Design a protein with these regions (language model features):
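Enzyme catalytic cores with a strong preference for nitrogen-chemistry domains
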Residues: 1-298, 302-308
Length: 308
């Protein structure tokens, strides 16, 4: 099976634009021979959608756009995994899940909901989402796959000295027979993040002896910056496919021979910080719809960065 890692730059709340973006990437993936294209966490709503999730009309429109995306992508003959939200249907607890949806043949055929909801640092997901209590592997092509959402795959007891959560979704899915891990993410950037991710997921790949497909969001959404830097690994924890940093990208990997396309020209830490800040400023202006800006230069380091 050929899997396309679709590293997209979603705009929070722009359901129509985000759906069109994913359809365009799905078309590119199909033309490149992919059987499956994987998008980041909450790629339909944009991340983080925050209080938009409290609007019933937004939830209605999200489901409508998801169904339309499934129908529009049907002629491409490529399966899609994308991030969305799902109503729980329960009168108790939070009303929605953070979900990964599988689209095939014009229909939504499977949903996996996020189990581990971060509430530290920049995250406040437990304010909006209900945690999933169960999960199951699914058959994608000729592979039994584990589908996880960001934090779900960041809790390997073999790596962390002290874990934030008692459950390990990856361990549970591997025990249930999953032979490949697909992880969709909206993982913000900080200095050293690429090396940290690689180390964590290499340990997970070796621990469970499974290849990993890790797809991350790219772009700036208000104060959060996402570097992308998506990758695929073999069971030895070696990177076999990799996407660019700080820009949209589409790369393919093959589960049969565990090969893929690589982007190895990554910036050093200093250049990465500059690219992250430039991307964040550029996206803030573009996504807010500003036609022009006034730059005030006072002579400090902030002014120097703005001028650069």
């Amino acid at each position: 099976m050929k899997i396309a890692l679709a590293q997209t730059n979603s705009t929070v709340g722009d359901l129509c634009g985000n759906a069109k973006l994913m359809l365009a990437f799905a078309r590119r993936a199909a033309e490149a021979g992919a059987n499956l294209v994987v998008f980041p966490e909450l790629s339909l709503t944009g991340y983080p959608p925050r209080d938009l999730l409290e609007k019933e009309s937004f939830l209605d429109r999200t489901e409508q756009h998801l169904e339309r995306l499934a129908a529009d992508a049907a002629p491409l003959n490529v399966s899609i995994i994308c991030g969305t939200v799902t109503r729980t249907g329960s009168p108790a607890g939070h009303p929605i899940y953070n979900s990964a949806a599988v689209l095939q043949g014009g229909r939504i055929v499977f949903r996996q909901h996020k189990m581990l909801l971060p509430t530290y640092d920049v995250f406040d997901e437990a304010r909006y989402f209900e945690p999933a209590t169960k999960q199951s592997p699914l058959a994608l092509g000729n592979a039994v796959s584990a589908l996880t959402i960001c934090e779900d795959a960041w809790n390997d007891k073999q790596y962390w000295e002290r874990r934030r959560y008692s459950r390990d979704p990856v361990e549970e899915l591997a025990s249930a027979g999953a032979r490949i891990l697909i992880s969709i993410n909206a993982s913000p950037y900080h200095m050293g993040k690429r090396a940290q991710r690689t180390e964590i997921f290499a340990a997970t790949a070796r621990h469970f002896r499974v290849p990993i497909v890790y797809v991350n969001q790219v772009g700036g959404n208000d104060q959060l910056l996402f570097d992308g830097t998506s990758f695929a690994m073999n069971p030895e924890g070696e990177v076999i496919a990799s996407a660019a940093s700080f820009e949209e990208d589409l790369v393919l990997m093959d589960t049969k021979d565990l090969t893929g396309e690589r982007h190895d020209n990554y910036p050093d830490e200093c250049d990465a910080v500059y690219q992250a800040l430039a991307m964040g400023t550029r996206d803030y202006i573009r996504k807010c719809g500003f036609a022009r800006v006034i730059i005030g230069l006072s002579g400090g380091i902030d002014s120097a960065l703005t001028a650069a």
